[in-house]
Amino acid sequence: LATTALPPDTDADIARVTEALAMITPRWNVRIMLALSGPPLRYSELAAKVSWLQGGQLHPKLKSLCDAGLVERTEHTARHVTYGHTERGAALLPVLPLIVTWAEEYLETAERPLPAIEQIEDSLTLLTRRHAAALLWALKTREEVSGRALARIVMPDSDWTNVYPPLRQLVADGLVDTEGMGRPYRLSAAGDGLGPVLGTLSAWSAGQLLNQAAHHPVWGHPQAKPAAKPWVSSQSRPSPAGLPPGRTGEPAPVWHNRELFSHATALRPKTAVPVGGPRR
C-alpha cells in the first residue's frame, strides 16, 4: 500500500480503511453480504436471493469474500456446503446504515427515489477514488491546505502536480471545497460529515469495538452520544438529525434484504442538499 508523509500510525490507519473499503466496494459484494444475513445458506439458496447475477458470476464473488475473511464456506458433507458471515463479516454490517445516513443527508437528490443499497453503493464509489482516504485524512487534520502541501503529505514520493487529478475529483464529488485555482483546499460539509463512517471503518479494521469510532483521533467526536435506535433498511426516513451509534457487543441489525433491494428511502428536502454537493 502507498505510504504517505503522515505519522506512521495514521498512515497505517488509512491503509487499513482503504483495504476495508476495497473488500466491500466491488460490484454486488454488499448485496451478497446482505443476502447472507441470517442462517448460513446453500449455494443454490444464495443464488436465488441474488438472481440478477449471471451464471458463473456468483462463485468468484463468494471466493473473494471468503479470501477477505468476510464469508466462510462450511463443508458439512461432500453434498452439503453452506455459506455465511464470519464474525468479522457480521461485525462490518453496522457501518452500512451509517453510510445510508450520510448519503441521505449529503448526496445530491436523484431523479428517482433510491433504495438504501444504491445509496450505499454510490457512497462507496466516492470513498474508493484513488488517494481519496489519504486526502480526506490530511484535510481533516490540517483544515486548509495548498495543493503543493497536500502533495508533500499524501504522495511525497511522486511529482507534486500528480495531486491535482484526485483533488479535482474530490471537489467534483463535493467532498472538498476550494475557492479556485491556487487557493487552499478544505473539507466540505459532506467531507467532514464522513467522520462516523470513516471512524467506524477504522475501528473495525483495527479489530476494535465499533464504539471506539467516537474516540478516533481524527474523525471522533467523544462528546457525541446519540440515543440508540434500530435501523430498518426499508424504513422511509426524513433528513436525519443524528447518526446511529456504532455497535459494540449487541446483535447485528436485522436486514430485510428484499426490502433493502427494492424499496426506496425518502428523498431529502432540497434545502438539505448543499450546492455542489456530492454527485452520484
Stretches with model-predicted labels:
Residues 123, 132-139, 147, 163-166, ...:
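Structured N-terminal alpha/beta-domain signature
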Residues 14-57, 119-159:
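N-terminal helix-turn-helix DNA-binding core of bacterial DNA-binding proteins
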Residues 77-99, 183-198:
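Basic, amphipathic "hinge/linker" alpha-helix immediately C-terminal to the N-terminal HTH DNA-binding motif
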Residues 66-76, 171-181:
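A short, conserved structural fragment
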Residues 150-152, 165-168, 217, 231-235:
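Clustered cysteine/histidine zinc-coordinating segments, centered on FYVE zinc fingers that bind PI3P
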Residues 1-15, 43, 49, 62, ...:
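Recognition helices and adjacent regulatory flanks at domain boundaries
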Residues 2, 96-138, 192-280:
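Amphipathic alpha-helical dimerization/coiled-coil segments
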Residues 52-67, 156-172:
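Short amphipathic alpha-helical interaction segments
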